[in-house]
Amino acid sequence: MKKIIIALGIAALCLAACKQAKQPEYVPLQPDLTVLLYPQGQAVDAGIVENGQQITLGPGEDNGLRGPEVVNPNGNIANIGDSARVDIYFPKNPNGLCIVNCPGGGYQIVSSINEGMCAAEWLTSQGVTVCSVNYRLPNFHRTVPLTDVQNAFRYCRAHAQEWGISKIGVMGYSAGGHLAATASTLYADDITRPDFSVLIYPVIDLTTLSITHVGTRHGLLGEIPSEDLVDLYSPQKQVTPETPETFIALSAYDNVVPPVNSFMYFQALQAHNVPCQMHIYPIGGHGWGFYHEPYHPDGLQQYREVFYTDLARFLQDQLPKAE
């Protein structure tokens, strides 16, 4: 019941925001299934058990966050701890792809509408099953977001046959893009390795303060991390020939996360002969995600459909080839 109340509360906030702005009423897509990643909370080292079989691992570190989540009118969620969960969205016409979706928010919040519900709305229209992760915020416990994403992969792999899934990729935005890139380079095994990656205006480099997004670096690693730790969590330094094929999208003039972050990851992929593509749009800035008119100003404006076409083509290329 608690997880249902959380989802309904976010939807109500979205509706209220639309009414206050005198915009057409927007009813956000609701998940078909919401699953707590740690049903017994972070204090118990246990994951999800179904039919007597454990299909995910436990929480590992406890991020120390207690009490209810805090959700603002834009659907940005803070204070995620025991309530870490996945929202599953099933398309009407599934094409065999699934995406583990990582909303951004500087590792301080999770952007559950713009980069969660709205993303799922478009992706399911393309036939993609979506597993959007409301991951634990690190609170200076750096391992917890990646642990949650890897458990989301384990959950989806366990249900792949049931859902008709042949490939599971990862997608992320800003700090969520950093998380998606980290999942693409620091995976634990074949189960947690993404089959493909989609990075939208991602934070990549954590080594250089003039390049990185300082809030993301601080939120994940703290104020004075070691050089080895910074290198480990700078995904461009962890790329190998086994890193998944990657789609990168960003705006040329991003004053929040400098575009050089994307360039560095793209160059690392090329250096290791990993298939990759990068799309740079002349407007949009940062954080445009999947917000769209008339419900919210669209930063991409006339390039929205260009982005959709580019991403749809990449996803189409991920479909199993007919023999």
Language model segments and positions:
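Short beta-strand element of the alpha/beta-hydrolase
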Residues: 96-104
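Catalytic nucleophile-loop/oxyanion-hole region of alpha/beta-hydrolase
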Residues: 110-120, 131-167, 298-305
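Primarily recognizes the serine-hydrolase "nucleophile elbow" in alpha/beta-hydrolase
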Residues: 151-215, 230
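Short beta-strand/loop motif that positions the catalytic acidic residue
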Residues: 242, 248-250, 254
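Conserved alpha/beta-hydrolase "acid-adjacent" motif
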Residues: 255-264
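C-terminal catalytic histidine-bearing segment of alpha/beta-hydrolase fold enzymes
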Residues: 263-323
